[in-house]
Amino acid sequence: YQINTRQFTKEGTFKAASVQLPRLKELGVGILWLMPIHPIGEVKRKGTLGSPYAVRDFRAVNPELGTLSDLRAFVERAHALGLRVIIDWVGNHTAWDNVLMTQHPEWYAKGPDGKPQPTPWFNWDDIIDLDYSKPALRRYMTDAMKYWVQEAGIDGYRVDAAGLVPQDFWDHASRELRAIKPVFMLTEWESRD
């Protein structure tokens, strides 16, 4: 069951969403998929709210949704009801103002002008692509994925635009995640080729 936390309840928070968990259990839901939980980029933002797929920090919770403790409490309540929780993982790209843009600009795909570029075939000008030929980026992203399993207790990921990231990255990351606990990996991909 997909949850866009900021629109799921009037409050738009993990705390408010957790109140709805017994109802979802009664409906027969077994897995909850939280759309991106991370802070949303402000540079080149689409609309007033921005796209949750324009991630500003892979290791932070969007403060509009709550805190890490709130997320952890949501997951714990879901687990107590026999529900599993996966979060959306946006591994191909970031917001223009992602912390990595300042800390590691070399981790971004570059256009002919040497500047970071958005994915060319979509109207995704609010995000820029990462360059998975960089081993340090691969380590960072794997560690960030492990962080949410360890710190929030999530049960896996729904991976956005999975085909834009090399398969060997997903193979390696999945092995590392499953060394922590069994995780569920759901991937999304639409090829324009």
Identify the residue ranges that each predicted region occupies.
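Short catalytic-loop micro-motif centered on adjacent basic/acidic residues
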Residues: 86, 156-162
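Substrate-binding/catalytic cleft of secreted carbohydrate-active enzymes
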Residues: 161, 185-188
